[in-house]
Regions:
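Conserved HGGG/HGGXW glycine-rich cap/lid loop of the alpha/beta-hydrolase fold
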Residues: 6-53
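Conserved serine/cysteine hydrolase catalytic core
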Residues: 165-222, 227-230
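Catalytic histidine-centered segment of alpha/beta-hydrolase-like enzymes
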Residues: 234-243, 247
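Flexible "cap/lid" loop of the alpha/beta hydrolase fold
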Residues: 93, 100-135
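Active-site loop/oxyanion-hole signature of alpha/beta-hydrolase fold enzymes
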Residues: 33, 42-80, 87, 248-251
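The conserved beta1-alpha1 loop
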Residues: 18-20, 81, 204
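Conserved alpha/beta-hydrolase catalytic His-Asp/Glu region
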Residues: 131-183, 187
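Short helix immediately C-terminal to the catalytic nucleophile in hydrolase catalytic domains
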Residues: 84, 88-92
Length: 255
């Protein structure tokens, strides 16, 4: 499978970014441009998202292998947020030779109890009468009641694209909705006792509940060289809510 990719920078070590659910590689553009003077940056659209192909199932180990193929043979600093963070962790555990450093953003190597919020988004997006949409403003209005937060609504609508056949969702809503348990889960049993012994930066939003002290034990077991940083004034989307702080933390880790 060939993933859609955007490359920036011509010199320095490689940094690869994996976005989260409903995201695209371009979500990292601001951070990537800032790094591109000193690093070769690769932004990937994850399978079932953006311009990348769709899969028939959702399995973190398979997704990690697909991203590993996209990376190639040269070790990289791998950065992943949320769903992309789980893909990145699985990749580091399965292909440690490809990962020089790992950055995990606001997610832990655990199964989360519920994906109700995400299921609600998917049901709303699937329920939209796409055939009747002529302008993006109509799509935004259709989402307004179920997704009152304008920032989240704008984020979801990045996946709504006009094609020759009219408007459509770029994200594989049917698959993600059907496999929400796998998406919020963690393939710990399938990974066995695997650990990753390289340096790991574990970044969380101080206002998010995706990272907590109760997750630290499993993080320490799988990634014994992790360093945890909480960013004030940020929730789950740390790099979007506090981009300058996130960039500074990342640069220090890369130095």
């Amino acid at each position: 499978m060939s993933l859609h990719r955007t490359e920036l920078g011509q010199t320095g070590s490689r940094v690869v970014f994996c976005h989260g659910l409903f995201g695209q590689g371009r979500n990292w553009t601001q951070i990537a441009k800032a790094l591109s003077a000193d690093h070769r940056v690769l932004l990937l659209d994850m399978p079932n998202h953006g311009r990348s192909p769709w899969t028939e199932t959702f399995d973190y180990l398979d997704l990690a292998d697909i991203v590993a193929d996209a990376i190639g043979d040269e070790p990289v600093t791998l950065v992943g947020h949320s769903m992309g963070g789980k893909i990145a962790m699985c990749l580091a555990l399965r292909h440690p030779e490809l990962v020089e450093r790992l950055v995990v953003v606001d997610v832990a190597p655990v199964a989360y109890a519920s994906g109700r919020e995400f299921v609600g988004y998917i049901e709303t997006m699937r329920g939209m009468d796409v055939a009747s949409i002529e302008r993006r403003e109509q799509a935004e209005e259709a989402l307004r009641e179920a997704v009152p937060n304008p920032v989240v609504r704008s984020f979801l609508l990045q996946n709504f694209r006009r094609t020759e056949d009219g408007w459509r969702w770029q994200v594989n809503l049917d698959l993600l909705g059907e496999h929400m348990a796998s998406l919020t889960g963690w393939p710990g049993e399938a990974l066995g006792p695997a650990t990753y012994d390289g340096p790991v930066l574990w970044v969380g939003g101080a206002g998010s509940d995706y990272i907590s002290d109760e997750h630290a034990g499993e993080m320490d077991r799988r990634f014994p060289r992790n360093r945890r940083v909480l960013v004030k004034g940020a929730g789950h989307w740390v790099h979007s809510e506090q981009p300058e702080v996130f960039l500074e933390v990342l640069r220090r880790f890369l130095a």
